[in-house]
């Protein structure tokens, strides 16, 4: 099954399951694609389709639960209600007061009210130009309820530093514009959120940020190619959970006080700005495309989608979306917008993301996703899928430095420098048919790790090409992800890390 077919099947099955359980399906294609890909990354050894659909259904239910339970106050008044520090709350701030203790007046979607004592780190939000609390949505966690709240007959949350005001872009354009134009404060796009652990087992969360340079004539964000990283640990480990990937974060006084900081510190404030699909004309579509990367130019790329050529336009500030891609990679690009002039043309938007599906382990180890080509004779121009191959000969042809070539579209193909070596390999399929295929540079590294003395070859002065006979290594059969381009050249994009049975 191909990836678009997989997404279509998941969507149909998930909608049917939710309807059977009297639940309203409430998810977008964009959410479904991202959740599916994150699961494929989480389980690289592979899993069955029933497990996949169950995981996605659970995630969908949890998503709805967060929207309903933690934005309601009713359940908190029950005697058996248990509140955990990691619980997140989303409430609307309708007012605040300064004395005797600076506090916020909050309400849920059913107009039930409560209060929250504001942590002193956020007193800046009472003053111009940051007095945006009234009318905003507040997200917070790591907060307890005042033990004697019942004396006031109103729930009262204690102060917390895991606290983020959330603004809707459409309702705060003038504020956003003034912040982007400011030389003291900085707006960032939240590109990614990753979790890692140190050698001592301490969890650290890293948020990848792209700086907003300016706004275009339509008010859309123009984003710098460079990336900033901020790490969260200790008392701030929960803060990134309050953020949304591909949305926008304002950090006051970044340019004058916090610039160069790599760790979130006491006194830092974040304000989240949410863009809806209708905020800009170019974001009215939520399209996505899957295909093999066939060509890259200075302002567009071309995908080969089962023989159909799809052009996707991007600006200079969006080049980083494709920085790790290589000709022949199977890409999933979303969301993108249809061109008004040509239905086969698309353009990137500010929250476009690119996933290299052919780099995932799962398509090579999960039967429900693998497109088994069975034998070499099934390979022809435009075909892509998976094939069992056994390596015979490895030929190192040179270094990937300023490597370009011409395609049938008469556009210059720029092959990004992913690895310094490029190579081709002679292989055989299960029927003992032999053929040659170009190797994606990361595949060269894979075989280099299996060949003794490989590094020593390049410590000597040797001329390319370098021929290595692999028969004596008895490498066995491996699943590979393979693609045949328009010039009938075979490209091996990914080799399974485990030999086939």
Swiss-Prot record:
One GO CC annotation: nucleoplasm
Cytoplasm found in the keyword field: yes
Gene Ontology annotations of biological process type: double-strand break repair via homologous recombination; Okazaki fragment processing involved in mitotic DNA replication
Location(s), subcellular: Nucleus; Cytoplasm
Major subcellular site: nucleus
Source organism, top-level taxon: Eukaryota
InterPro entries per record: Cdc24_OB1 (IPR035201), Cdc24_OB2 (IPR035200), Cdc24_OB3 (IPR035203)
Keyword entries, A-Z: Cell cycle, Cytoplasm, Nucleus
Claim: Cytoplasm is one of the keywords in the record: yes
Bilayer-spanning residue ranges: none
Assembly behavior: Interacts with dna2, pcn1 and rfc1.
Function: Has a role in the progression of DNA replication and in the maintenance of genomic integrity. Acts during S phase, after initiation, where it is essential for completion.
Name of the protein: Cell division control protein 24
